[in-house]
Amino acid sequence: VISFARGVPAPECLAVEELADCARAALERNGRTILSYGPGGGYGPLREWLGERHGVEPGRIVITSGSLQGFVFLAQQLVRPGTRVLVEAPTYDRPLTILTRLGAEVVTVPMDEDGLVPDELPEGEFAFLYTIPTFQNPSGRTLSLERRRRLAELARERRLLVLEDDPYGLVRYEGEPLPSVFELAEGEQIAYCSSFSKTVAPGLRVGWFVLPAQLAAQIEALAVSTYISPPYLSQATVLELVQRGSFEPNLERVTGLLRERRDAMLEALELQMPEDASWTRPEGGYFVWLDLPSGPPAADLLAQAEAAGVTFVRGTDFFPGGRGGERSARLAFSFVSPGEIAEGVSRLGSLARAAAPASL
């Protein structure tokens, strides 16, 4: 099966030998500490490094077992049944599942080609706004600089907490980097999270949050009550990679491998899709969003595609209650080879063209 379903790095992106060496070095240097329990907010030296990177005190950094675990903690702290939470439409499906499980009322904010539309934020009280401004999951879109400034302004004016999720920001193939909303707002009303899953390795399970001091303490307490302390060995391994100067060269290598896949995906879509199809052209990240106005419903297309040996994620999965994306698909290009991408999109294209009206 050719899978466009999961946003995970290809096996060749993983620096196995160097990470093994980093883990060995970390154990030799500080093994008795990193093999024991410790503070629930994470490995102190890595918190210090992240604090310097973001210009905050280390106590405002909480390192979690992947950033999604941190999202669970944040939602548990802020959400009760009936609590209103804002999300982009479409948005990452796993936070939708978490919020629904907690009984939140999920309210959507529309997007266009420039990302979330800040001036469409509805009035009222909300626990927070969840946004992925850079190379968004699932759409691949990036929030423009003007809109980032506007979002920071609105967050300040309305005292709205914004959770900026930024796991893909460093995985850029072209174009100039944009400042984060957190940077533009100088941290006011913005909580920031990211992860080493897309830049180093997902199996390390190292994500982090930059939070207001009081909220950071509350989230750390939740972490302690949940798993006592996060795994320090993986955090120390990441820190060793950073401190020996290997993070940036590895990121450049990973970005090059993923750029080839992004290019292969865009080329294949251009060749294979019916004339009325449209798709995003991300400058980074892992995903392309495909719209097929004349195609079958995404659930039907997925069933046909799986029978043809291809899988993807239905657009409906990224909208609360499945209300949207009925003829859309998220295609992840990060895991499969360029050759597999060409073949998989060819199979999808055949199915899409077969469903399109003859005039197309």
PLM features: residue spans?
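N-terminal "arm"/small-domain region of PLP-dependent enzymes with the aminotransferase-like
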Residues: 1-40, 52, 160, 306-311, ...
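Conserved core of the PLP fold type I
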Residues: 32-158, 169-187, 258, 356
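Glycine-centered flexible beta-alpha turn that most often forms the glycine-rich phosphate-binding loop
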Residues: 165
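Active-site PLP attachment segment
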Residues: 182-218, 230-233
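Structural signature of PLP-dependent enzymes
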Residues: 219-226, 242-266, 295-297
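Conserved glycine-rich beta-strand-loop-beta hairpin in the small C-terminal domain of fold type I
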Residues: 239, 256-266, 277-291
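Short, conserved charged micro-motifs
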Residues: 296-301, 339-343
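PLP-dependent enzyme catalytic core of the Aspartate aminotransferase-like
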Residues: 307, 322-360
